[in-house]
Amino acid sequence: MGIIKKFRITTFKKEIPKISLKRISLSFNKRQILEDISFTVREGEICGLLGPNGVGKSTIFNIMIGLIAPDFGDIYIDQKKVTDIPIYKRSLDYGVSIVPQTGGLFSDLSCLQNLTAIGEIVIKNKNERIYKIENMISKFELEAVKNIKAKYLSGGQKKRVAIAMSLLSDPRILLMDEPFQGLDILSTRQLQQTIVNLQTEDSSRACLISDHAARDLLAISDRAIILANKKIISQGTPSELLKDENARSVYFGKDFKVN
């Protein structure tokens, strides 16, 4: 896999659990999808969720937001059990927001219209809604494309709009499902920096990001979790993972390094 250059110098010190999965298992049509999945994402942390395509990363996200109910196990937010809390309540009452792998944009709506559509759902006060949308357009450097339909935006622009949409509700837990997929190197580096900046600005938010490739994700992660064969095979800081022989043999390969 080669050498990865660190983007984020970790100053993360907190040990406050924000969202936890405890012994989650799931099967579908008698086929085991996930088995005994347990991990915690802490306040202020960027945590990576790594694993090959089809291993269940998106399924874990769907369980976390309440779209899928596990066969066994529980989900906790701020150490409160939310396993039976419906999806809309997890979003509005517990501050869970997701940037889906597909982006979640309405292709025939402009950047501004996409933001407004979500803003009208999550921000009731009109003046506050207008202010937040304008702030997101500025923060994500979308002014030049705000009136362009989403289907005409570049991959990097679409990702920035999708993240801006997810942040309108001021989430305490931000999930990003493969945000670097389909981006060129420059767009990936820009998005990495954007994510790091967001966490630096708000150290109370927990951020969980999935990817199948370690290179881009470990560069910004404080910790990471590796999935393989339905289970977690390792979790820890990037340095700890690279010292784990099981993680190296199953996932990284012997030549992978963090610079």
Describe every region a protein language model picked out.
Residues 50-52:
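The feature captures the beta-strand-to-loop junction immediately N-terminal to the Walker
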Residues 65:
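Helix-to-loop junction immediately C-terminal to a conserved catalytic motif
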Residues 149-153:
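Conserved ABC ATPase signature
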Residues 127-145, 193-196:
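Conserved ABC ATPase "signature" region
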Residues 174-178:
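Catalytic Walker B motif of ABC-type/P-loop ATPase nucleotide-binding domains
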Residues 19-21, 34:
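Conserved structural motif at the start of ABC-family nucleotide-binding domains
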